[in-house]
Amino acid sequence: QAMFPEGGLSRDGYLRPPKIGLLDSMLCSKEDRSFTRDLLFVPVGINYDRVLEDRVLVGESDDKPKTTKAGMFKRTLSIIFGNAMKFWNRQIRKNGHATVHFGDPISFDEWHGQRGVDIFTLDKKNRRQHVAEFCEKVMNEVGLLIPVTPVCLVCDVLVREPVITIDALTSAVEKGIEEFRGLGAIVVAEEKGAEWMVEGALLRLGLRHVIKQNEQTVRVNPDDARIVAYYANSVAHYRKGGIPTVEKPNYV
């Protein structure tokens, strides 16, 4: 079965630390000694040139009153319906890449056998200390599979240089391709070259009025700076050296 170790969608684009309770509840099936099958976790990395509900997610900031689940559901439906109508009327162009990568299965039994202790004989607090380490192992594998799409790559530059010439942007994206590859990332459509990636990303961002562009210069719309940051943040963990560390005391 599929699960989101983070416990939900990211509101700022960052890869979030895992929720220990979710995995702990699954792993506790091993407390039943008659259950002898291995538990295999297949890490999956997904990223997009466009997340349909990005404006809804970005709007859910900590310094604003929280939207109720019903309110968020209605807003999300409204955005999805609006996009569907645009597709129907052929008013919106291709949304770009939606890319998924699957990693090698992670065997819980193999990991557990290397612990030197049966974690299911421990009390809840100590067991969850071990489960937290397994969570981090899984999420680190997920993080290494998150693709770097053209829009994310361009936004990674624009978040630092909100006003930039197209030539400078293309040069920065070219360097970004090499940097992310060196960090072990999968760069989507890198074979097309930086110029092609920039052209496509700016087209999609421009259609949404996230950026303003003339023949020489690109400028981020200040009202949508957080949208640019959202896509840049989705690949920021490569530079930070991995996912945020689980704060174990919060989960015991």
Predicted regions and their residues:
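Membrane-interfacial terminal anchoring regions of lipid-handling membrane enzymes
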Residues: 1-252
